[in-house]
């Protein structure tokens, strides 16, 4: 029987929520543990499907993986493989990060092109160009990527675009190369900086992670380390937008306010009062919500593409008009047609969606087709009269550590059920 979320209109939210570790940080760090010769201990690891799938890959490669609460212990000393099975690789996009780690560790890697959210093309070409610059052969044929190098060498390489995945793969591969590697036009996301900090804790000679230029002195053996994953800025944005949508007051603990500046600014424009501490964010929305200024998703430090769906959903009840433009993933707006089923007045022109807010919303049967779009449907249904049913909850579980329980604790009315019918 398929699982579904039943979501009713929410009262104003109230309480405290703790932000989990960042999905987009823990996944590359888990891949990076393959480069260590001794065990690693990672704190603040979210319990999400993508982490579960990554641990399955590590175990297949010979690593020992144990979880205790939010702490993962990874022992790579049993490492014995250099290929990821298609069934595991196809479960998520982040499996591509094992290419760089395996290439650095063994000089060879094979991987079926990975799956993930169907939000647009995320070509592997940038990754392969980086591997070739380091002296590897790297080809994709029939849906399988194969990389090989007798010996990797340092190089100055410039990425065609600031791709997060390509930056991470280039960093990992460069650690196995002799000499210095300079990565130009690198992605600057906080998760890149977190990966760099973890690698430095393991003994890597690396500078500039989180800036457009990263320098790596490769060829050094890495040891294990104990490390704490940074807070998830997209989960943070989701909670903030939920409060903006439903009203009330929330305090978020273990947050990273600086990484959420774009979302905080947009919600401040809407009439929300937000106060930030060192690792806390308090949001209060009592009066009516007003439309924010038009938002365009851009690479960090621009507005995060992953936060746009939940901000758009929060704006459904806002008074006025606004627009949302996507510049990164061409199919990001798959969820828009589902929000229309709730009565939302949305029009799409290419990569821009225009919203006329404050339209009456009613319950509907919805289907999540991707992770962040699924979260947007939850926030939309929390504003609609009646009880909505959301299918495809596995997409939400890929990246949120029990979103249902967190929102329930703040007063939201939602629950997971098994639906005994085919939909």
Predicted regions and their residues:
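Short, structured segments at the rim of ligand-binding sites
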Residues: 1-423
């Amino acid at each position: 029987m398929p699982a579904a979320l039943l979501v009713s209109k929410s009262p104003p939210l109230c309480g405290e929520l703790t932000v989990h570790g960042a999905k987009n940080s823990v996944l590359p760090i888990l891949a990076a543990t393959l480069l260590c010769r001794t065990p690693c201990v990672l704190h603040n690891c979210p319990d999400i499907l993508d982490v579960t799938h990554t641990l399955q890959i590590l175990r297949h490669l010979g690593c020992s993986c144990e979880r205790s609460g939010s702490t993962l212990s990874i022992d790579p000393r049993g490492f014995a493989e250099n290929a990821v099975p298609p069934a595991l690789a196809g479960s998520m996009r982040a499996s591509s990060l094992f290419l760089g780690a395996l290439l650095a560790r063994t000089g060879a890697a094979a991987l079926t092109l990975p799956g993930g959210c169907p939000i647009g093309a995320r070509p592997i070409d940038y990754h392969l160009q980086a591997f070739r610059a380091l002296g590897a052969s790297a080809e994709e044929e029939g849906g399988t990527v194969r990389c090989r190098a007798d010996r990797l060498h340092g190089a100055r390489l410039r990425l065609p675009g600031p791709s997060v995945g390509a930056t991470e793969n280039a960093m990992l591969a460069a650690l196995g190369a002799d000499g210095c590697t300079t990565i130009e036009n690198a992605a600057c996301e906080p998760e890149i900086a977190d990966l760099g900090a973890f690698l430095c804790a393991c003994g890597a000679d690396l500078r500039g992670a989180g800036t457009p230029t990263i320098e790596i002195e490769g060829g050094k053996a890495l040891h294990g380390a104990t490390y704490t994953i940074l807070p998830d800025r997209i989960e943070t944005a989701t909670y903030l937008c939920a409060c903006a949508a439903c009203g009330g007051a929330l305090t978020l603990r273990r947050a990273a306010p600086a990484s959420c500046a774009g979302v905080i600014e947009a919600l401040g424009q809407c009439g929300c009062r937000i106060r930030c501490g060192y690792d806390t964010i308090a949001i209060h929305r009592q009066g009516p919500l007003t439309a924010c200024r038009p938002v365009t998703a851009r690479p960090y430090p621009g507005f995060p593409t992953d936060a746009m769906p939940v901000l758009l959903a929060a704006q459904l009840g806002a008074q006025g008009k606004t627009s949302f433009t996507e510049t990164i993933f061409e199919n990001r707006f798959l969820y828009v047609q589902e929000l229309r089923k709730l009565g939302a007045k949305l029009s799409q022109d290419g990569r821009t969606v225009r919203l006329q807010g404050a339209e009456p919303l009613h319950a509907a049967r919805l289907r999540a087709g991707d992770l962040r779009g699924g979260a947007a449907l939850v926030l939309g249904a929390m504003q609609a009269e009646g009880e909505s049913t959301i299918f495809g909850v596995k997409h939400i579980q890929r990246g949120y550590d029990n979103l249902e329980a967190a929102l329930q604790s703040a007063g939201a009315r939602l629950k997971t059920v098994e639906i005994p019918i085919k939909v």
